[in-house]
Regions:
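Short, compositionally biased segments
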Residues: 122-123
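Small-residue helix/turn framework positions
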Residues: 6-23, 30, 39-84, 88-110, ...
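C-terminal low-complexity, glycine/proline- and small-hydrophobic-enriched intrinsically disordered tails
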Residues: 347-353, 358-361
Length: 368
């Protein structure tokens, strides 16, 4: 009977067709099926390229999909079918993948060239969909990542990723994701490890945990709507000029230009903590420590602003890159070497929500 169910050669030309759980429009498929290997050429609005499906020995997880695509457009609606699988026994039965796409569009965002190599691995109490390589490249950045999606007994799921993001233009990268006019230029690197409960494509903020390090050079925060990229509006300190009559208010209200931003941070259950975020600019040096609650969109930060520091103080500020050195240690060193700098140093305690922060100036050198 199998030879009647599975054709050796086929050609499909249809306005709409469902293939591999994806709804394809204006589709043309030509392919062959021989000895467990499907070889298909696909032309549609969603997929354009060559697919090879190697059947497994009894279940989907044993199979392998190899694809070389000119373009792939994944819509948000197409993910609903995957989400609906989360309560089913075969959630972890995803095949091995070897996919290269010249132009990936994900949920309306153009990501660029994408490569993914992954395979399904079983262990005593569950299964792991292991991401051996995930690489995304476009003119603005290059991401290299690896990790896993683990399902254990009781259908508990967790996604884990290690990543390195090489940033060529931070402003254009943010614009690619819909956050325009937030930053101008900016080159650098962000790397770290993150994990969250649930599916790889459904970031769960309450369980988000991990660590990151950041270094970005030569850019400028623009005067942007705080509603866009809210977390960046916290870091850029655009709320300070609106609430305090500062001598250096123009530094932030017109957009802080920076030579370098460095930071190390840890994330636990959606709360990010740092002891050494530093921004060096021509007109000021800014340092922060404290926590940001990504879940509640709130913060508890100690902020230090040193406008137009002199050469001696600048040498100390530029040396403030050691993750082991906190703001308190830096200020103690600076005030010891340059006592007059205490008069020009402004410290603030910033709490409340991202959209309506509470800012209180504190005595320099005390943090309170």
């Amino acid at each position: 009977l199998a030879q009647y169910v599975y054709p050796r050669y086929f050609s499909i030309d249809a306005g709409e067709v469902v293939a591999m759980d994806m709804w394809l429009t204006n589709a043309r498929l030509n392919g062959t099926h021989q000895e467990g290997l499907w070889d298909i050429d696909v032309r549609s609005e969603q997929i354009n390229g060559r697919l090879k499906w190697m059947e497994g020995a009894g279940n989907t997880a044993d199979g392998k999909l190899v694809a070389r695509l000119k373009s792939l457009n994944i819509l948000q609606s197409s993910m609903k079918k995957v989400s609906d699988m989360t309560g089913r026994e075969d959630i972890y039965r995803i095949p091995s993948l070897d996919i290269v796409t010249d132009d990936l569009t994900l949920f309306g965002k153009h990501l660029g060239r994408t490569e993914i190599v992954a395979n399904n691995v079983s262990f005593k109490n569950g299964r792991e969909w292991r991401i051996n390589r995930l690489k995304i490249t476009n003119p603005d950045a290059a991401l290299e990542s690896s990790g896993s999606w683990v399902t254990t007994a009781g259908n508990r799921q967790q996604t884990r990723l290690s990543y390195v993001l090489n940033i060529k233009d931070a402003g254009k990268l943010l614009a690619r994701f819909g956050y325009e006019d937030i930053i101008r230029r900016g080159r650098g690197e962000m790397k770290g490890d993150i994990s969250w409960d649930g599916l790889p494509f459904a970031l769960d903020i309450p369980s988000l945990s991990g660590k990151l390090s950041l270094r970005v050079e030569t850019g400028q925060f623009l005067k942007a709507d705080p509603g866009a990229a809210k977390l960046l509006s916290v870091i850029s300190l655009q709320s300070l000029p609106r609430r305090l009559n500062l001598d250096f208010r123009d530094i932030f209200s017109k957009g802080f230009a920076f030579d370098e931003i460095t930071a190390n941070a840890g994330i636990a259950n959606g709360i990010m903590r740092t002891e050494n975020l530093k921004m060096n600019g021509v007109n000021a040096t800014v340092m922060m420590d404290g926590s940001v609650d990504i879940r509640q969109e709130s913060q508890d930060l100690h902020v230090v602003v040193i406008p137009e520091i002199n050469a001696a103080a600048a040498s100390i500020a530029y040396g403030f890159i050691n993750p082991a050195i906190g703001i308190g240690t830096f200020l103690a060193q600076m005030f010891l070497r340059e006592p007059l700098m205490k008069q020009f140093t402004h410290e603030y305690h910033v709490t409340g929500s991202w959209s309506d922060p509470v800012i209180v100036e504190v005595k320099a050198g005390t943090g309170k």
